[in-house]
């Protein structure tokens, strides 16, 4: 075994921000005691952490905590509670600008050499551009062509005004999507892609379980499978991509991505199969925006999904919209009482960027000082209230004097 450092328990206190001895029993004290007594520990990381300016620093603290717990023999694990389907799979495939497939840093010489041998191409050692950097390049007139696949930055990016200006400044905007999204409406070229059930593949959920997605119908009208579209675009550049079939790509993943090694698509079965545990995500793979000062006396707007309903797919379903079809604003009972608001009131949420109107929900479990508006209702244009790099966002809330007409999801274009 490995000798346990004498200060390991003190390290736990430091990692969780425990106050000095004698400060009294509170949340951090109880957490430290539970971590010391528990046989195993799983840390669940919410998506709000990844959105915050403190994401990198907090993730580094969590990495330190997991290291101490590992020395204590706790067998710790960390799981991100992603709010997008297959986000874990996208990260595993190298979807982060500073990561290679398998969540290995781009500076890893051995990992780059392995990929270079298999792909017959040089792998850059410097991180690529994330979405923030890409949009900045657009605004600066340095983006010749921007190719967007399966996402809608005009709705998802936390600053609609900036995203609109940036996308409009690109010399050429190409969108590949199954739906005519707001972003596709700005594009010079739209490549209609297959939707769910129109092509085969796999996805990896939050717990690392990889499952099959099977094709059960052909793409409608002129739409093509995403692989076929990528092959078509490559051919326009006189390039041939290999492998180019879904089965061949899975075999390559199982060969080159450590967490997937040894898996076969036939062996996934009806319930899927777990990928192998990988080292904790290095904090350096996340962006480090400057901290945003917050005023203690201001209401702060946060956002997220309502249930498992982020709107990109689910808002296009009449059936799913019967479960959560009305946008709302959630606040604490204390804040609403101070503002003279009641449950069910139509309220205006206003920031320095814009405003929206929705029905108020008073939640007695909600902490004072926070306002929550789910992001999955496209008609609200919630991101019109947000400014890039500023999250949470300071807002004011007041009662609306008239009930506005808010588009219901049933009147939103659903694509093909």
Where are these regions (language model features)?
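Extended redox/cofactor-interaction regions of prokaryotic respiratory oxidoreductases
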Residues: 1-33, 58-186, 192-207, 216, ...
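Long, contiguous, secondary-structure-rich segments that constitute the structural scaffold
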Residues: 24-26, 214-272, 314-330, 334-416
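Flexible, glycine/charged-enriched surface loops at secondary-structure junctions
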Residues: 42, 72-81, 241-248
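Short glycine-rich or small-residue beta-strand-to-loop segments that form or flank ligand, phosphate
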Residues: 42-52, 62, 149
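Flexible glycine/proline-enriched surface loops and loop-helix/loop-strand junctions
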Residues: 44-46, 209-218
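Short strand-coil-strand connectors
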Residues: 137, 144, 211, 350-354
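Catalytic alpha/beta core of large soluble enzyme barrels
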Residues: 191-192, 375
């Amino acid at each position: 075994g490995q000798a346990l450092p004498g200060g390991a328990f003190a390290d736990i206190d430091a990692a969780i921000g425990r106050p000095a001895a004698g400060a009294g029993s509170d949340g951090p004290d109880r957490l430290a005691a539970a971590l010391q007594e528990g046989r195993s520990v799983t840390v669940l990381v919410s998506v709000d952490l990844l959105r915050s300016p403190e994401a990198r620093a907090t993730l580094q603290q969590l990495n330190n905590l997991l290291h101490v717990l590992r020395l204590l023999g706790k067998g710790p694990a960390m799981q991100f509670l992603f709010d997008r389907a297959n986000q874990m799979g996208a990260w595993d495939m190298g979807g982060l600008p500073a990561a290679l497939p398998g969540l290995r840093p781009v500076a890893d010489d051995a990992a780059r050499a392995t990929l270079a041998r298999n792909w017959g191409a040089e792998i850059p050692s410097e991180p690529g551009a994330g979405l923030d950097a890409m949009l900045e390049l657009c605004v600066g007139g340095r983006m010749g062509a921007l190719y967007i696949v399966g996402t809608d930055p005009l709705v998802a990016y936390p600053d609609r005004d900036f995203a609109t200006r940036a996308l409009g400044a690109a010399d050429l905007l190409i969108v590949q999507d199954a739906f005519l999204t707001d972003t596709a409406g700005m594009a010079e070229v739209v490549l209609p892609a297959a939707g769910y059930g129109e092509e085969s593949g796999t996805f990896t959920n939050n717990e690392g379980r990889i499952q099959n997605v099977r094709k059960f119908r052909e793409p409608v009208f002129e739409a093509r499978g995403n692989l076929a579209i990528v092959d078509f675009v490559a051919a326009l550049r006189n390039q041939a991509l290999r492998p180019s079939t879904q089965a061949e790509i899975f075999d390559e993943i199982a060969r080159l991505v450590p967490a997937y090694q040894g898996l076969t698509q036939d062996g996934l079965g009806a319930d899927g199969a777990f990928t192998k545990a990988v080292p904790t995500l290095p904090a350096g793979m996340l962006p480090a925006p400057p901290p945003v000062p917050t005023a203690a006396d201001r209401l702060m707007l946060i956002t997220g999904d309502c249930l498992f309903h982020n709107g990109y797919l689910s808002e296009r379903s009449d059936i799913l919209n019967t479960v959560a079809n009305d946008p709302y604003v959630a606040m604490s009972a204390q804040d609403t009482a101070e503002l003279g608001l009641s449950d069910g009131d139509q309220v205006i949420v206003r920031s320095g960027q814009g405003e929206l109107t929705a029905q108020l929900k008073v939640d007695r479990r909600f902490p004072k000082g926070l306002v929550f508006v789910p992001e999955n209702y496209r008609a609200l244009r919630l991101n019109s209230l947000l400014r890039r790099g500023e999250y949470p966002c300071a807002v004011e809330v007041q009662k609306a004097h008239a009930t506005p007409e808010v588009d219901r999801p049933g009147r939103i274009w659903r694509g093909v």
